[in-house]
């Protein structure tokens, strides 16, 4: 009887998590080090040897995404080593692309944003992994 109660409780907890949206959080591979961009949808997740990758999608501009991660990661001790913007954001070009490389200790985080013309949604690629330096 106890095993039935345990199984039922486990199923109920899983159902509650799905309903409440906790399955839409960043994958465990990011170990709470990188947050999901607010209201962004997780599109793809991969585990890599020594790291992980997540692809997100949002209706916000790439500039807004970049500023969020710059501020958020700086508050948690990461420093920016590389920041590149491939077209000025003020041109309001829908194909703007931006890239950030941040480091903390022996880990590196690369963030790439891109807004394709056909979808209008900004794609966010996050790569987190160990560094060799």
List each model region and its residues.
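Bacterial N-terminal signal peptides that target proteins for export
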Residues: 1-9
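An acidic-aromatic pocket/loop used at catalytic or ligand-binding sites
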Residues: 22-133
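Bacterial N-terminal signal peptides
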Residues: 9-18
């Amino acid at each position: 009887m106890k095993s039935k109660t345990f199984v039922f409780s486990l199923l109920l907890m899983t159902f509650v998590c799905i309903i409440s949206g906790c399955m839409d959080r960043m994958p465990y591979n990011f170990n709470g080090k990188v947050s999901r961009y607010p209201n962004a949808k997780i599109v793809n997740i991969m585990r890599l040897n020594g790291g992980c990758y997540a692809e997100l999608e949002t209706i916000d501009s790439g500039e807004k995404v970049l500023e969020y991660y710059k501020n958020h990661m700086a508050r948690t001790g990461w420093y920016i080593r590389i920041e590149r913007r491939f077209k000025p954001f003020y041109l309001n070009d829908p194909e703007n692309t931006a890239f950030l490389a941040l480091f903390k200790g022996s880990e590196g985080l690369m963030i790439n944003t891109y807004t394709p013309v056909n979808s209008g949604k900004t794609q966010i690629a996050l790569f987190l992994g160990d560094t060799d330096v």
